[in-house]
From Swiss-Prot:
Gene name of this polypeptide: tyrS
GO MF term set: ATP binding; RNA binding; tyrosine-tRNA ligase activity
A Pfam family the protein falls into: SYY_C-terminal
Database matches in Gene3D superfamilies: HUPs, RNA-binding S4 domain, Tyrosyl-Transfer RNA Synthetase
Protein name as it appears in the record: Tyrosine--tRNA ligase
Role noted for this protein: Catalyzes the attachment of tyrosine to tRNA(Tyr) in a two-step reaction: tyrosine is first activated by ATP to form Tyr-AMP and then transferred to the acceptor end of tRNA(Tyr).
Domain S4 RNA-binding: 349-416
PANTHER family linked: TYROSINE--TRNA LIGASE, MITOCHONDRIAL, TYROSYL-TRNA SYNTHETASE
Any one GO CC term of the record: cytosol
Length: 416
């Protein structure tokens, strides 16, 4: 099967320039292709997974994947998808972000069939007069103004700096075409204009027979019409310090039945048969959420590894059952990151007083009532003795006390 057919089945193709020509090229040889990312932050988020999952599929199929870290383009800002001018970063920020993104890319793509480059290495060598003479003459301003990425900004205004972004991205494509034997650029749907500008530049500089292609991915929307990738808490990051593997796992586990098969096709390497089986289970046994569970397992393993999957599942099972005693300190940090927390001393104290002092209970009367009724669990154990003494240093390396009030309300007490 041609990889384009596989991508089409997975719903991963928005537009292709000269599909017939690209098909023939893919059948004939190992193709060089690339995707770029500007270092606007020090971590990728799940929105970045959309083009990079496609790049990974090409890599797995034996094609030569390239990633451009946009140290040059990132210093001026891509107007794509933005309603206003980007705030320029300091070069120190850009360098820091470049290093962080490169590390993440190496983790995701490994060492085989992957080349990571920085476009500052060649863009910084072009002087102003050379830029205007060698490249400026080849770009028609009317054509540039009609590109969606620019046209959408004309009413509110766009700086010359961001206006020229598509020229720099075109230079990138030409550079990789000439020096790295790269014939295909992939990107999000909003990158179509920038990518096709690069194809035009290659044809003008190398001749109309030069093989250069564009492939874009559809904008991914959820069943409710909102954009994929955002949560109430903001972006979902690939950096475990920003979004823990447990949070990452929960994000995928909580996907809507209407979306889960689409995400399994796009964000996993499961076969058509495996996904068809899970699709049937969504229809016949939706309450088991097997498709969501498999989606969470596959995505966490891809981004964080197998051990992270085990940890996330262990935390989920412990919080669901209330059996939290077996959690490690690291797992507690992950699982309780966004739950209410208080600081306490290591001093042992009567449970009623302790619950009121921590603010978990509003009054001693309420505390006594909840304890007596069995509504309070300390580190997984139901406590109904009003004379019980809490010793914060007794478990979890003396770092935490886990309190559950009722069936689902958790609190984390951190020992000072």
């Amino acid at each position: 099967m041609n990889i384009l057919d596989e991508l089409a089945w997975r719903g991963a193709i928005n537009q292709v320039s000269d599909e017939e020509g690209l098909r023939k090229l893919l059948d004939k040889k190992s193709v060089g292709l690339y995707c770029g990312v500007d270092p606007t932050g020090d971590s990728l988020h799940i929105g970045h997974l959309i083009p990079f999952m496609m790049l990974k599929r090409f890599q797995e199929a034996g094609h030569r994947a390239h990633i451009i870290i946009g140290g040059g383009t990132g210093s001026i800002g891509d107007p794509s998808g933005k309603k206003s001018e980007r705030v320029l970063q300091t070069m120190e920020q850009v360098h820091h972000n470049e290093e962080a993104l490169t590390k993440q890319m190496k983790h995701l793509f490994g060492k085989d069939n992957i080349t990571i480059v920085n476009n500052r290495d060649w863009l910084s060598k072009i002087d102003l007069l050379g830029f205007l003479r060698d490249y400026g003459k080849l770009f028609n301003v009317n054509t540039m103004l009609n590109k969606e990425v620019v046209a959408s900004r004309l009413e509110v205004g766009i700086s010359f700096t961001e206006f020229t972004y598509q020229i720099l991205q075109s230079i990138d494509f030409h550079h990789l075409w000439k020096n790295n034997d790269v014939q295909l650029q992939i990107g999000g749907a909003d990158q179509w204009g920038n990518i096709t500008s690069g194809i035009d530049l290659i044809h003008k500089m190398e001749g109309s027979e030069a093989e250069a292609y564009a492939l874009t991915i559809p904008l991914m929307l959820k069943a409710d019409g909102t954009k994929f990738g955002k949560t109430a808490g903001g972006a979902v990051w690939l950096d475990p310090e920003k979004t823990t593997p447990y949070e990452f796992y929960q994000f995928w586990l909580n996907q809507d039945d209407r979306d889960v098969i689409k995400y399994l096709k796009y964000f996993t390497f499961l076969s058509q048969e495996e996904i068809a089986d899970l699709e049937e289970k969504v229809k016949t046994q939706p309450e088991k959420r097997e498709a969501q569970r498999r989606l969470a397992e596959e995505t966490v393993e891809f981004v964080h590894g197998k051990e992270a999957v085990k940890e996330a599942e262990h935390i989920s099972a412990a919080l669901f059952s209330g059996e939290v005693k077996d959690l490690t300190a690291s797992e507690i940090e992950q699982g309780f990151k966004n739950m209410p927390s208080v600081e306490v001393t290591a001093e042992p104290k009567n449970i009623v007083e302790w619950l009121v002092d921590t603010g978990i209970e509003s009054s001693k009367r309420q505390a006594r009532e909840d304890v007596t009724n069995g509504a309070i669990r300390i580190n997984g154990d139901r406590i109904q003795d009003l004379e019980f003494t809490i010793d914060p240093s007794a478990e979890f390396d003396g770092k935490f006390v886990i309190v559950r009030r009722g069936k689902k309300k958790y609190f984390l007490a951190r020992v000072k």
